[in-house]
Each structure stands twice: as structure tokens, then as C-alpha cells.
Swiss-Prot record:
Gene3D superfamilies: 3.40.630.30. It comes from Bacillus subtilis (strain 168). PANTHER family: N-ACETYLTRANSFERASE, RIBOSOMAL-PROTEIN-ALANINE ACETYLTRANSFERASE. Residues 1-156 form the N-acetyltransferase domain. This is Uncharacterized protein YqjY. The lineage of its organism: Bacteria, Bacillati, Bacillota, Bacilli, Bacillales. Homotetramer. One of its GO terms (molecular function) is acyltransferase activity, transferring groups other than amino-acyl groups. Pfam families: Acetyltransf_1. InterPro entries: AcTrfase_GNAT_prd (IPR017255), Acyl_CoA_acyltransferase (IPR016181), GNAT_dom (IPR000182). It comes from the Bacteria.
Length: 156
């Protein structure tokens, strides 16, 4: 398994698989090209035999340099349960730690039970939100009206 930083030219390759990897959910608009142009040093792709198996898009906060943020990550459905996601998170965390970050944050939708379980398994804590949905603390309207989100934080 190879891990490398992303490049601008990876945009089409990554965005072309989003809907397929997420079971038909329309997610391409959640990952604009700007991430591939401005956050290359903290975003990564895994591959095997020149085929992409996973990716992680993240960055160090400019507003709070001790905080890093994972914007989007994914693993090819045929390669799940092989620790690829964990490897991507580990490389990202080590990279931002070297830049002085002491915590990593990320968000997910309250309906994404797999993501919630995955992040808690990786040691992320759910931040106390503004309401509770199905026993999970969420921030109401975090990404706009009706777009509640679960916020995670992990001290590193």
C-alpha cells in the first residue's frame, strides 16, 4: 500500500468515485477543487498497483493553528476493513502534529452511524452540541438550515 500527498491533478480521480463509494449519495459538491490546490501537504491518497484505494482531505486551521481539520475521507468499498482509513488518519495526525497541532476535528451527519462508530473507535470524542438526536449530541443547522452535524475532536 502506497501513501502520498495529493496533487491538483487528483481532483477528477477522487471526485469521480464519491457517489459510487457512498452508495449513490450525491457528494461531489462537498469536495471542490480548492482542496486539491491549497491543502496538498496535509491531504493524502492511498493506492495499490496504481489504483486509488482511499483518500483523506485535511488541513491545519489558519484561525486556530493548534487545530487540524479532516474535511473528507473515504476508502474504496473493496478495501474496507483493511486499516486503510486508520493509516490515512495516522499519517494526517503525524503530519499536523509536526506542525504544532494538538487536536484534530471533523464532522459527520447524524444519520451516518458508520462514521460515528468509526470516529469513536479511532479515539475521537463527540462534542456537546445544541441538541440530541437518537442519543447522539449534534449541532443544529451546523451546515445550514436542516443540516445538523455531529462534531468530533481528538487531542493528539
Amino acid at each position: 500500500m502506497d501513501i502520498r500527498t495529493i496533487t491538483s491533478s487528483d481532483y477528477e480521480m477522487v471526485t469521480s468515485v464519491l457517489n459510487e463509494w457512498w452508495g449513490g449519495r450525491q457528494l461531489k459538491e462537498k469536495l471542490p477543487r480548492l482542496f486539491f490546490e491549497h491543502f496538498q501537504d496535509t491531504s493524502f491518497i492511498t493506492s495499490e498497483h496504481n489504483s486509488m484505494t482511499g483518500f483523506l482531505i485535511g488541513f491545519q486551521s489558519q484561525s486556530d493553528p493548534e487545530t487540524a481539520y479532516i474535511h473528507f475521507s473515504g476508502v474504496h468499498p473493496d478495501f474496507r476493513k483493511m486499516q486503510i482509513g486508520k493509516q490515512l488518519y495516522d499519517v494526517f495526525i503525524e503530519t499536523v502534529k509536526q506542525r504544532g497541532c494538538t487536536r484534530v476535528k471533523c464532522v459527520t451527519s447524524p444519520v451516518n452511524k458508520v462514521s460515528i462508530a468509526y470516529h469513536t473507535k479511532l479515539g475521537f470524542d463527540i462534542e456537546k452540541g445544541t441538541k440530541t438526536v437518537n442519543g447522539i449530541s449534534v449541532f443544529a443547522n451546523y451546515d445550514g438550515p436542516g443540516q445538523d452535524r455531529v462534531l468530533f475532536v481528538k487531542n493528539i
